[in-house]
Amino acid sequence: MENVVIQTEFIKLQDLLKFTNLVSTGGEAKERIQACEVTVNGEVCTMRGKKIRPGDDVAFQGAHYTVSYADP
């Protein structure tokens, strides 16, 4: 499991997938999320705008990420 550090209160799920280079475009993120390929905290998530906050776990195609916060 890898750690993703954000400097904001949250990051949208589709933006997290792009930020971690799991997908290359927002369109691809939308497709993957709507195809039920992404889990958040162990549950399938189909909301691409879901707010991912520090402490959340995101998994996609065998990659697992935990989000943490760093003061700006």
Regions found by a protein language model. Give the residues of each.
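C-terminal structural segments of small proteins and small subunits
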Residues: 45-72
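Intrinsically disordered, low-complexity regions of eukaryotic proteins
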Residues: 4, 39, 58-59
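A basic, amphipathic helix-loop patch mediating RNA/tRNA/ribosome contacts
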Residues: 11-54
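A detector for short, charged/polar N-terminal pre-domain segments
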Residues: 1-11, 67
